[in-house]
């Protein structure tokens, strides 16, 4: 496809438009397409007919707002109504009613849906495009075997292969092969038609013997042979009348449905002119494909590259939602058919409203959003994460690949990805290369292909003309890959430029160029485009950086980056975290909750987000940026959101950093930091945790929320109000009661006296007691209560419990064990917090904030951090901010180094500080030891890079166990922080303890602290009375388990003692 865009490109495209356009396409076209497929339903006597009148369908605006749907844990959806009619054929009467089919979850402008109060997003999937592909493989003898694979719309495969004798065979789903003559005859063609419609009839006749002629003597014989090979389990199949229709329906229509995309690809690859609406595999397709396969055998064609993007298609949110809608309508059809038959059987008069229920559509979409692998909970750690999540492309999911089976060729970068899929941004681990990210300017075309924009170079017209090219079209053009700003310098006709043509990178003259790139960021995703000096980094470290930026925690005092790339403002705008003025006017009132704007004769109130929790427990908060009485324009920023300053993305802080070793505290990627970062709240972040509890109706009565909890200390209940809920604004510690709840419980008969039980039996009195089931604050949850929500479900019953949500705000300073990172893949763990007077200090007396290990730079080959560090120092001194596009070396050699040195020289000159730029060692400076005041021996690189605090924090990971739960079988402690588990002592840890000879510690690890039941029970009592812990006599439980498993294999294992005196054998039970 060759699409024409707008002339010029002053702004970037909307970064959320991929998701939103897909949903709009589903509402505009997908709904009507599936509704038109809904058949007319008749009863068995063909007296009543039910049908839908699709032209009158309507979607109703939701009755609740997005914020209320999140607050009340509801689904933000629209009700779908369609006109339906019942037609009595005898009397020709029509009863028409508007029926409610179900709820369809809606998508907001950010590309997300709210299902059960949770933001969810649907990921785009990359699949092999339906059509035919020719490939060549070597068999076990080293001979090339040519195959043609026909892929259906749902992923089924039909393979055609040609052997050494030029005989053509067909395999369905990689099962046993049959002759192509049998396949074509089963599809309805006779031998004469086959020979008339092929280019090489002599090849088809060459392997036609008596046995083969018998198989294709008639259509019934061919179908019987086909059925015998692929569907018959055993025995000799017979040919019933319905077998032909059944086989045509189940195989040739369902399994070989090409779809519109598949039909288009087949026509283009095989040079056919079959109508586009004929979406099923035809005999003509098979025969033409066989002709091309014969041509491949004799080197008269080109093989297909399966990994080229022209052979891939994007299964967007529109396709996924349309598939689910079609599935729901099939279920609805079966339900209506059964209801009509039941009504006729019991002689009831049905109506359209009685026949249709909303259950199929509602349950289908709830199941899709809750269980489908491509429907994921929106990651809302920071504004960048929200945008990047919606632009992911996945090879995984139904009909796709798996992380275990995907080959390296699929994961690798392909030349067709250029400008469409980012070569940097992908996941780490088993899914590397299988989950990618769209390039910034890429868009998804009508046929599911990824299109990339280019500027057309025209000698006739001086106007800039922009084209969107699909992967199948850009191979025919010479595309200049250099930046057009560099190309515009000097005489273009005399320049030699790098270009791309037919998957090859060439160097050609300017007059041979057809198209050129539009932007230097065109090839990268959003995450990679935010890395300054990315061209100086190794690709692996750039990958880590693009992933770690999505893990950055919004800080309480955000700060713009000194060195950026220029995309920070666009990301912040499209993330939805900013409050933008929709109309121009004057600010007449503002507070922390809202901004009131007067303009165009009306008053508009803009509510602000105040301490709202994200699903990663980070704090989403908006702060007003306008003053009362000021006039504003449409599109102006009213309030900054989390991790934004002045409308720009601000994920971290510019801190003073030195690259030097310091007493070994920063070895192996450890980081030494100053206590200034703690006391001045430089890296302080707010986190909001949600705790919930439900009330049920039990068999002994309903559970009660109350503040009168027996047998609990008053101190634990100090924060509860009269209703049993924690008071808003109170400070709570671990172990405090957040919600007081009592569950009724039947008392045990054995706990009462005999006369009491006799009296109750005579009078029939049942005495029940209550069990305390309060919501307690777990370890590590201390903080301030900021919100309490009591949600009452309509028609409250045991299946619709009441839910109470408690939100607690935590203030976290940076501490030892937290993870910090730069934007170049340079990450580390805080190892020590040093007093600021002991930190190394500069020649002007300023102490350094962080000390990084210089050995982490050369081996990782991420030199971009050094450029950013030095340029950040110049920007900090000169009070400037820099926005640098990548690959600036295309203008001239060493452009990045010249820029950094010139800015450092200017900063040194303006401030009269020669130590900022010293010609002997530019970028370095001599600094002093804060403990002794003596200068270090070597000059050190200092600067102001942009450092992020990541969500991997020690408060979420640190864990200790005194006692807890044990596994039922092995009787060993469970694993994991959530289960209050223990720390595993494995085989290598035992070797280490053995190497140091600590026998008693090793025995404790393997007995008292692990799975010796009797010994660990004695430890507590012995410790209390101050006695000596006795040694365990018998074996631990895991050894007993081993003995039992051996006995199940008929292997007896016992303990024998042989006396030294009389050699008697004493048997002891294990």
UniProtKB/Swiss-Prot annotation:
Segments passing through the bilayer: none
The keyword Cell division appears for this protein: no
Superkingdom in the source lineage: Eukaryota
Gene Ontology cellular-component annotations: chloroplast; DNA-directed RNA polymerase complex; mitochondrion
EC number per UniProt: 2.7.7.6
Coiled-coil spans in chain: none
GO molecular function terms noted in the UniProt entry: DNA binding; DNA-directed RNA polymerase activity; ribonucleoside binding
Protein purpose: DNA-dependent RNA polymerase catalyzes the transcription of DNA into RNA using the four ribonucleoside triphosphates as substrates.
Recorded family membership: Belongs to the RNA polymerase beta chain family.
Quaternary organization: In plastids the minimal PEP RNA polymerase catalytic core is composed of four subunits: alpha, beta, beta', and beta''. When a (nuclear-encoded) sigma factor is associated with the core the holoenzyme is formed, which can initiate transcription.
Protein name listed in UniProt: DNA-directed RNA polymerase subunit beta
Organism for this UniProt entry: Lotus japonicus (Lotus corniculatus var. japonicus)
């Amino acid at each position: 496809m060759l699409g024409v865009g707008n002339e010029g490109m002053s702004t970037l495209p909307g970064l959320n438009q991929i998701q939103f356009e897909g949903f709009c396409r589903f509402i505009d076209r997908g709904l009507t397409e599936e509704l038109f497929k809904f058949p007319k339903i008749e009863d068995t006597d063909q007296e009543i007919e039910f049908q839908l009148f699709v032209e009158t369908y309507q979607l109703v605006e939701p009755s609740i707002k997005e914020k209320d749907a999140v607050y009340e844990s509801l689904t933000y959806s629209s009700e779908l109504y369609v006109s339906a009619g019942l037609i009595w054929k005898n009397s020709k009467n029509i009863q028409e009613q508007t029926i409610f089919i179900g709820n369809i979850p809606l998508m907001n402008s950010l590309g997300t849906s709210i299902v059960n109060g949770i933001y969810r997003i649907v990921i785009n999937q990359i699949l092999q495009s339906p059509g035919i592909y020719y490939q060549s493989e070597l068999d076990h003898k080293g001979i090339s075997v040519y195959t043609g694979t026909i892929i259906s719309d749902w992923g089924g495969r039909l393979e055609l292969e040609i052997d050494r004798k030029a005989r053509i065979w067909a395999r369905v789903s990689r099962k046993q092969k049959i002759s192509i003559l049998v396949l074509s005859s089963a599809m309805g063609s006779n031998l004469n038609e086959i020979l008339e419609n092929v280019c090489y009839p002599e090849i088809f006749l060459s392997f036609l013997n008596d046995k083969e002629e018998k198989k294709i003597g008639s259509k019934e014989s061919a179908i019987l042979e086909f059925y015998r090979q692929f569907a018959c389990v055993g025995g000799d199949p017979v040919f019933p009348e319905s077998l032909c229709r059944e086989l045509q329906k189940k195989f040739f229509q369902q399994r070989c449905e090409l779809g519109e995309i598949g039909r288009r690809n087949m026509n283009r690859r095989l040079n056919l002119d079959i109508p586009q609406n004929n979406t099923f595999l035809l005999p003509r397709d098979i025969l033409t494909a066989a002709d091309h396969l014969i041509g491949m055998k004799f080197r008269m064609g080109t093989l297909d590259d399966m990994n080229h993007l022209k052979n891939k298609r994007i299964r967007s949110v529109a396709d996924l939602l349309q598939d689910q809608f079609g599935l729901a309508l099939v279920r609805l059809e079966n339900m209506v058919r059964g209801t009509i038959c039941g009504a006729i059987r019991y002689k009831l008069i049905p109506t359209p409203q009685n026949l249709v229920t909303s259950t199929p559509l509602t349950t289908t979409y709830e199941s899709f959003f809750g269980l489908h692998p491509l429907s994921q909970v929106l990651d809302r750690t920071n504004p960048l994460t929200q945008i990047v999540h919606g632009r992911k492309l996945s090879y995984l999911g139904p009909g796709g690949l798996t992380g275990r089976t995907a080959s390296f060729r699929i994961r690798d970068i392909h030349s067709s990805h250029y400008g469409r899929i980012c070569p940097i941004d992908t996941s780490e681990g088993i899914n590397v290369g299988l989950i990618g990210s769209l390039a910034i300017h890429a868009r998804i075309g009508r046929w599911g292909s990824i299109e990339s924009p280019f500027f057309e170079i025209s000698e006739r017209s001086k106007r800039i003309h922009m084209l969107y090219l699909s992967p199948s079209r850009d191979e025919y053009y010479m595309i200049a890959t250099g930046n057009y700003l560099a190309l515009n310098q000097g005489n273009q006709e005399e320049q030699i430029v790098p270009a791309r043509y037919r998957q090859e990178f060439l160097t050609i003259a300017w007059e041979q160029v057809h198209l050129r790139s539009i932007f230097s960021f065109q090839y990268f995703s959003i995450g990679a485009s935010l890395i300054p000096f990315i061209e100086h980094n190794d690709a692996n470290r750039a990958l880590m950086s693009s992933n770690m930026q999505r893990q950055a925690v919004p800080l309480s005092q955000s700060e713009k980056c000194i060195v950026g790339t220029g995309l920070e403002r666009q990301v912040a705008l499209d993330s939805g975290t900013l409050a933008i003025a929709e109309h121009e006017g004057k600010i007449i009132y503002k507070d922390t909750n809202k901004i009131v704007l007067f303009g165009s004769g009306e008053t508009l109130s803009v509510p602000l987000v105040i301490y709202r929790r994200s699903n990663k427990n980070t704090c989403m908060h908006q702060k007003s940026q306008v003053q009362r009485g000021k006039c504003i324009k449409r599109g102006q920023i009213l309030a900054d959101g989390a991790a934004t300053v002045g409308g720009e993305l601000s994920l971290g802080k510019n801190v003073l950093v030195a690259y030097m070793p310091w007493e070994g505290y920063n070895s192996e990627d450890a980081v030494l930091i100053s206590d200034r970062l703690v006391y001045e709240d430089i890296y302080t972040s707010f986190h909001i945790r949600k705790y919930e509890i439900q009330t049920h109706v039990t068999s002994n009565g309903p559970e009660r929320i109350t503040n009168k909890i027996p047998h609990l200390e008053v101190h634990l209940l100090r924060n509860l109000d009269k209703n049993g809920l924690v008071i808003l604004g109170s400070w709570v510690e671990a172990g405090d009661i957040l919600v007081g709840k009592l569950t009724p419980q039947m008392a045990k008969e054995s706990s009462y006296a005999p006369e009491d039980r006799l009296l109750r039996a005579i009078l029939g009195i049942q005495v029940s007691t209550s069990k305390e089931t309060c919501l307690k604050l777990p370890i590590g949850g201390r903080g301030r209560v900021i919100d309490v929500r009591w949600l009452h479900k309509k028609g409250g019953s045991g299946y619709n419990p009441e839910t109470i949500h408690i939100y607690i705000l935590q203030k976290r300073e940076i501490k030892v064990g937290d993870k910090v990172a730069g934007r170049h893949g340079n990450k580390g763990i805080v190892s020590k917090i040093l007093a600021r007077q002991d930190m190394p200090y500069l020649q002007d007396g300023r102490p350094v904030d962080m000390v990084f290990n210089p050995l982490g730079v050369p081996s990782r080959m991420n030199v971009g951090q050094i450029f950013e560090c030095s340029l950040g120092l110049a920007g900090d001194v000169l009070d400037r901010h820099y926005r640098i596009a990548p690959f600036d070396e295309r203008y001239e050699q060493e452009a990045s180094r010249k820029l950094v040195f010139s800015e450092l020289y200017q900063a040194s000159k303006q401030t009269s500080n020669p130590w900022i730029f010293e010609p002997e060692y530019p970028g370095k400076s001599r600094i002093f030891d804060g403990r002794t005041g003596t200068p270090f021996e070597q000059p050190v690189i200092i600067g102001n890079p942009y450092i992020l605090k990541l969500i991997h924090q020690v408060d979420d990971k640190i864990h200790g166990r005194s006692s807890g739960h044990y596994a039922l079988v092995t009787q060993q402690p469970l694993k994991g922080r959530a289960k209050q588990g223990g720390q595993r002592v494995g085989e290598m840890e035992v070797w280490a303890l053995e190497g140091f000879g600590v026998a008693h510690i090793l025995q404790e690890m393997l007995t008292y602290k692990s799975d010796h039941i009797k010994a660990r029970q004695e430890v507590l009592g012995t410790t209390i009375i101050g006695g000596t812990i006795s040694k365990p006599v018998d074996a631990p439980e895991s050894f007993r388990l081993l003995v039992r498993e051996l006995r199940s294999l008929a292997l007896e294992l016992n303990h024998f003692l042989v006396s030294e005196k009389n050699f008697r054998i004493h048997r002891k039970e294990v």
